Amino acid sequence: MIDREKEYYMKTDKIKNKLTSPASRRTLWDLGIILMIVTVAVLTAYSVNGIYPFGSQSIARGDMVQQTIPAGMYYVWDVLHGKANPFFTWNSGLGMNISGAVSLGALFSPLNLFLYFSTRSYLYQFVNILMILKMIAIAYAMYFYLRKYDTERIAYVIGSVLYAFGAASLVHFQIMLVMDAAFLLPLIMIGIDRIFEDRGSLFFIVFFTMAMMVNVYTGCITLIYLLLSAGARTFLEDDRDKAIKKKWILRLGVSVVVSLLLSAVIVLPALRSIMEAPRSGDGNFLNTYMTALQAQWSDYEWSMVERMCVNMALPVAAIIGFVILAARSSGYVKKYRGHIFVVIALLLSVIIPSVELLWHGGSRASWPVRFIYVISFVLIDFAMLLYQDHRDRESKPSKTSTDRWLSVVISLVVCIAAGRIFYKIYEAYCGQAAYATLGDGFLCLLVEAVFAGIYVFLLKSHRNRLAVLVVLCAQLAVTSVVSFAPNKENSTVFSSGYLEQANNVAKNMETETEAFERIKNTDYKIDHIHYPLVLGKQAISNYWHVISPDLQPNFSALGYSINWTQLLDAGGTIFSDTLLHIQYDLSYRELPGSMYRLCENIDNGNGEQIGLYQNNLELPFAIQTDTQELAASGEKFDTQNALYQAITGSSDTLIRDVSADINGSVYSTQVGAGRKVLYFYGTNSTEQPVSILVNGEQIYIPNSDTSENISYPKDFGNGLICLGSFENETVEVQFSGDVDASLLHLGWLDYDMLKSAAESIQKDNGDITLLKQKHAGVRLKIENVTKEYVFLPISYDKGWRCKVNGKKVTIRSIDGMMSVPVEKGSDSIVLKYSPSGRKAGIVISLITLLVCLAGAYLLKKGKITQDQKGIVILSSVAYEIFGIVYAVFVAVLFAVPVLYYLKGILISTQQ
């Protein structure tokens, strides 16, 4: 016991001494400087652009508004606080698998722990603060990587902040996943160096496993770079004995395989979800490859590439200068062959569109060069290596604390001044007619050229590290002013104002909703697709992007709008809304009092009131039915009628199709006693739009551009449109537009019939004594069951597992919802969701972990010893395999696309 206490105190003292040592204090000083530079440079850009906390503007724009912030901040905040499941969500699509979307959105990033610093209602403003925190974290990761070089500490600081202010942060921050990859890359490369130096593989395995689990997409991009750099290091730079190189390749290969196996628990479900999504290709490698070879840069994409030329001037100037210097010395160029090869390969990856596309797996939607973080890393890393080898090593008197503080203050003052001065220049530039053509890309290239010239002069003539730091701070402020300016990617639904309005509605909404009480964005005055995540409510609407291929067809058949990979609330009927437990409607325009009651008016923060209405009708969550399975019809009214008959057991027609009564462009009728609701949908295209007047009043169609849209169809309005509720009156519908009447469909829904059916179901359905929503499942108990099946308004998916009274049963689909076989009497139903690939992933990851732990323990205890002869054989095999793989890799990713590109240029020139 005494020996253990003594050992404990010795370890404690050792840690304490290490933390208080001069080296640790110097590290803390460096980290403090990095924090100040990043914070001041970004806040300067915020200040001049009127971005919070200096104004009402936000860095939110583009995909941040509709995807990144709702999913990556609001939903992750709920996950971190135990309010949501990271793989399955009830907030969207009436319950859906989000394993693929979570991976592509980097929702598992350790940087998301910063969200604990914010309340939920403050997240809209907190995104501006989160940006700074992420950039600081990226800089810190790079700092610890760069410390392997024998240079002055100021070089570590400069390299770190340069990396943090790369295009991954200043351009790709709109899809935050690139920033998360940028944070992990230096840590992974620390692990690579440890493997290379035979100091263990654990560090690499931990962080590369994390990279794959955080985002399988950028994880694969990082893996491509690891292969590229490892081959260059092995075959072009490593002068060690071949036997040593073989062992290094074996260690690296085993470490990569272990990481991939450990990450399987997350990666396998993510890959299955991604591959099944409608957006994914056919999975044919040859087709994808041939398509990629024919890729060409569009003007928009190339303008994005130009914008990514930020804060590369210093490392590029250093590389060019020092390589020229190295060329004068015999043998020096050979030392850098691997780095030069990688730089050239990455340069080709930006210039040749097919190579760029292959880095992304052969396809992508906008956002080119998502591997820009790799380019920034390689340039800074190479520049540091060259600086280490060619810097002036003359001993100089160390600076006093006062000198260091003065240097920092000067740098920060210059940073602030440069940002404010350049803002005036940028403002004037944006006012020029040429800005519409040249855009920010031209200005970014010009800034890089100017600063490159300054750096060349400083490095060649003075080599004054302080001067370089001061100039760098000025450049960081200048590039930040351009990058964070809220004058781009902010049109229509991509404006931060829409996100702010959704956030305001979430804050001001007083009505509480229970589990399975869904909400509907009727007219999209709150112009936000992912609004349920912001409100923390449940709805159909979502923009997870990677969704089940059945979701869109199922909801479209019921008359709900779909757009690209988005599901929207707009559409449907009062029947389908009631059946799907959509009990609340958000609407800017007044809804019929015969069908809804107003709960409250909610201020959206823009001087407008959004009405929250409650559906007057209600159906039980679980409804008994004799229908086992039902496929959707191609005609929306038929689908609604078939579903009504399946639920009620009646043969009555709920919606009477009167499309044949349209006379030219007019439909007119007399509605008698009994409430009727008129619905419209068209099969016309956007090239043949139609607008609608009902009794002389304009009908508005949901649209992403404006709430005043009158054309059908539109992106948010291409399903069923409610034309009004009528009783004892004449109704005249006028269609304007050159559209064939056969493409227009009208149907009368008998509201009184629906109301009577709802009351009958409530009376005869039996009692639901338990209804509990789990994060990825449901528990319910129903008494007095008299029919064979129970309908549940939950999206059908093969990942659902169901037990009824403890026995496994097979669920079926009724128009994309669930049909559960039950027993007469009392039924206890338990539903659990497990995405495809999860069980296999768990088994693979668990076995790998146990094997690794057991092997490490047995080696430590001496129970097993390394078979040196076996290792030699395995190393030789691994080395040969790696050589073949590397040759094929270089040929497929670089050689063939470059030759194909040059062939195209040659043909164009000849023509």
Give the residues covered by each predicted segment.
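Contiguous transmembrane helix-bundle modules in multi-pass membrane proteins
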Residues: 199, 218, 336-501, 721-723, ...
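Extracytoplasmic/lumenal acceptor-recognition loop(s) of multi-pass membrane glycoenzymes
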Residues: 94, 100-104, 472-492, 508-579, ...
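A cross-kingdom signal targeting lumenal/periplasmic-facing segments of multi-pass membrane
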Residues: 111-115, 542-663, 668-674, 685, ...
